Amino acid sequence: MEIPVYNASGEIVKNINISEDVFGVPFNEALVHQAFVAQQANARQGTQSTKTRGEVQGSSRKIYRQKGTGNARMGTNRSPVRRHGGVAFGPRPRDFSKDLPKKMRRQAIRCVLSFKLESGELKVIDQLSFDEPKTRDMAKILTALQVISPTLIAVDNPDTNFIKSARNIPAVKTTPANLLNISDMLKNKQLVMTEEAVRQVEELWGQRSG
């Protein structure tokens, strides 16, 4: 399988062969959805908490006698129906994490990479290096490539100049190639990768590596 490689001016400079084991996988919507939900769940802290009627401050004495006042019967002022009372059935700390087998997680990444390539949402550039941080230069490159926002840029070894050149552009996110994940790729319409990043991805998620 061959794909074109662009330079910083948006011109095709060559074609490279890429692995069909990584970029030629049929799309499995159910698998990708499962992997996305698992990643989102694993990112949750699960530390939200409310106080029950047994934990809020206040007396446990019955507010007034059961009968004879004409009012509705009432117990402690810590009851959930009263102001400053405890919360009934509120959120408690819990573990939201979901386990996903390694092979399923890796196959889901291959599915998304293949879908991006097939739908024209993946572009490969020969290199992305900057002598100094220049947002203008990065913006010119993205314009020349005719990318669609939001954009995810993956490189093999991001340096400070590259990160600073891209971080001030709206709807542009950068990531090391070895940290590509389902969530970032699905949330960003366009994926831009350097040639070295493509090779790193093939090595990481090729069939021989698991």
From Swiss-Prot:
Under the heading InterPro entries, the entry gives: Ribosomal_uL4, Ribosomal_uL4-like, Ribosomal_uL4_dom_sf
State the Gene Ontology terms under molecular function: rRNA binding; structural constituent of ribosome
- Region listing for Disordered, in residue ranges: 41-60, 67-98
| Superkingdom of the organism of origin | Bacteria
* A GO cellular component entry from the record: ribosome
UniProt lists compositionally biased (Polar residues) regions at: 41-51
Spell out the Gene3D superfamilies in the cross-references: 3.40.1370.10
- GO BP annotations listed: translation
* Coiled coil location: none
- Cite the entry's keywords alphabetically: Ribonucleoprotein, Ribosomal protein, RNA-binding, rRNA-binding
Protein family according to the UniProt entry: Belongs to the universal ribosomal protein uL4 family.
- Known partners and oligomeric status: Part of the 50S ribosomal subunit.
Biological role stated in the UniProt entry: One of the primary rRNA binding proteins, this protein initially binds near the 5'-end of the 23S rRNA. It is important during the early stages of 50S assembly. It makes multiple contacts with different domains of the 23S rRNA in the assembled 50S subunit and ribosome. Forms part of the polypeptide exit tunnel.
This one is known as Large ribosomal subunit protein uL4
Q: Which organism is it from?
A: Dehalococcoides mccartyi (strain ATCC BAA-2100 / JCM 16839 / KCTC 5957 / BAV1)
